[in-house]
Amino acid sequence: MLPCFQLLRIGGGRGGDLYTFHPPAGAGCTYRLGHRADLCDVALRPQQEPGLISGIHAELHAEPRGDDWRVSLEDHSSQGTLVNNVRLPRGHRLELSDGDLLTFGPEGPPGTSPSEFYFMFQQVRVKPQDFAAITIPRSRGEARVGAGFRPMLPSQGAPQRPLSTFSPAPKATLILNSIGSLSKLRPQPLTFSPSWGGPKSLPVPAPPGEMGTTPSAPPQRNRRKSVHRVLAELDDESEPPENPPPVLMEPRKKLRVDKAPLTPTGNRRGRPRKYPVSAPMAPPAVGGGEPCAAPCCCLPQEETVAWVQCDGCDVWFHVACVGCSIQAAREADFRCPGCRAGIQT
């Protein structure tokens, strides 16, 4: 892995949008930037205002610091160089930090187009074959052919990128992300996130009616308790349905809640059916407010009337008439006084 630093061009024209610098080992060096391609390592050729970029506009000074590089920027232009939108005094060196924004050229007034040469500075570690070319610094005053960008020779068998064309801006951003550089670029529109996926479909919850048993299925032997809801009297109520549908019934509960309207006569319904109509034990006849099987039925007048069935004789009783609670009926078997007397004898 090579300790390098990079200049990523943001916006501007086409081509030359990513420059990677690797100074020679063990010695410092200087890179020049300007419109004189014969004197500079990075040629800045403006398309709009040629006079805004000097022949040698600025210099990058790289000095070894441990296993990394200390990079400073020095301005030599007549139009100015900005670091993080602050103009650098001419001839003054400023040490750069990872993520600094460099602008070569004057800062235009509000409402005008920005400079063509707007770069982001970053320090990275790359493999030699990851980039097609790395800048080799020129000697001061040297204008020989071969300086500037030179191709890096990859390892044996490794593919080499062509030098005829440069990567477009989106591809340059992808390269930066692939080597773990500058997370500040990730929210930008040019950043591509391969881990993105389409919207995941959420599971559709089952309707509450599917959680309990259906009214058509006969209840099992051990489910003998129920709660029967009697609604307020309504004169315009229609005929009651054959099978009152349960609102909610959990698989192991002995009590359930049934909704049943009143009959046209205005009287309350009797106790609920234990089995469907086809079963041999039919519910008591509706009408007359039939009491439960308790010797002394108190005829509860509440809106919700709780019924409990004897586990011995299958006879229905009002919970209030037998003196037990709904919770006790759920948790334990219930036997009427007659069945309890038979067991004792």
From Swiss-Prot:
<feature type="binding site">
    <location>
        <position position="313"/>
    </location>
    <ligand>
        <name>Zn(2+) 2</name>
    </ligand>
</feature>
<dbReference type="InterPro" id="IPR019786">
    <property type="entry name" value="Zinc_finger_PHD-type_CS"/>
</dbReference>
<keyword id="KW-0863">Zinc-finger</keyword>
<dbReference type="InterPro" id="IPR019787">
    <property type="entry name" value="Znf_PHD-finger"/>
</dbReference>
<dbReference type="InterPro" id="IPR039095">
    <property type="entry name" value="TCF19_PHD"/>
</dbReference>
<keyword id="KW-0479">Metal-binding</keyword>
<feature type="modified residue" description="Phosphoserine">
    <location>
        <position position="78"/>
    </location>
</feature>
<dbReference type="InterPro" id="IPR042803">
    <property type="entry name" value="TCF19"/>
</dbReference>
<feature type="zinc finger region" description="PHD-type">
    <location>
        <begin position="293"/>
        <end position="342"/>
    </location>
</feature>
<comment type="function">
    <text>Potential transcription factor that may play a role in the regulation of genes involved in cell cycle G1/S transition. May bind to regulatory elements of genes, including the promoter of the transcription factor FOXO1.</text>
</comment>
<feature type="domain" description="FHA">
    <location>
        <begin position="31"/>
        <end position="88"/>
    </location>
</feature>
<keyword id="KW-0539">Nucleus</keyword>
<keyword id="KW-0597">Phosphoprotein</keyword>
<protein>
    <recommendedName>
        <fullName>Transcription factor 19</fullName>
    </recommendedName>
</protein>
<dbReference type="InterPro" id="IPR013083">
    <property type="entry name" value="Znf_RING/FYVE/PHD"/>
</dbReference>
<dbReference type="Pfam" id="PF00628">
    <property type="entry name" value="PHD"/>
</dbReference>
<dbReference type="InterPro" id="IPR011011">
    <property type="entry name" value="Znf_FYVE_PHD"/>
</dbReference>
<keyword id="KW-0804">Transcription</keyword>
<feature type="binding site">
    <location>
        <position position="336"/>
    </location>
    <ligand>
        <name>Zn(2+) 2</name>
    </ligand>
</feature>
<dbReference type="GO" id="GO:0008270">
    <property type="term" value="F:zinc ion binding"/>
</dbReference>
<keyword id="KW-0805">Transcription regulation</keyword>
<feature type="binding site">
    <location>
        <position position="310"/>
    </location>
    <ligand>
        <name>Zn(2+) 2</name>
    </ligand>
</feature>
<feature type="binding site">
    <location>
        <position position="339"/>
    </location>
    <ligand>
        <name>Zn(2+) 2</name>
    </ligand>
</feature>
<feature type="binding site">
    <location>
        <position position="318"/>
    </location>
    <ligand>
        <name>Zn(2+) 1</name>
    </ligand>
</feature>
<dbReference type="InterPro" id="IPR008984">
    <property type="entry name" value="SMAD_FHA_dom_sf"/>
</dbReference>
<feature type="binding site">
    <location>
        <position position="296"/>
    </location>
    <ligand>
        <name>Zn(2+) 1</name>
    </ligand>
</feature>
<dbReference type="GO" id="GO:0010468">
    <property type="term" value="P:regulation of gene expression"/>
</dbReference>
<dbReference type="InterPro" id="IPR000253">
    <property type="entry name" value="FHA_dom"/>
</dbReference>
<dbReference type="GO" id="GO:0005634">
    <property type="term" value="C:nucleus"/>
</dbReference>
<feature type="binding site">
    <location>
        <position position="298"/>
    </location>
    <ligand>
        <name>Zn(2+) 1</name>
    </ligand>
</feature>
<feature type="region of interest" description="Disordered">
    <location>
        <begin position="190"/>
        <end position="227"/>
    </location>
</feature>
<keyword id="KW-0862">Zinc</keyword>
<dbReference type="Pfam" id="PF00498">
    <property type="entry name" value="FHA"/>
</dbReference>
<dbReference type="InterPro" id="IPR001965">
    <property type="entry name" value="Znf_PHD"/>
</dbReference>
<feature type="binding site">
    <location>
        <position position="321"/>
    </location>
    <ligand>
        <name>Zn(2+) 1</name>
    </ligand>
</feature>
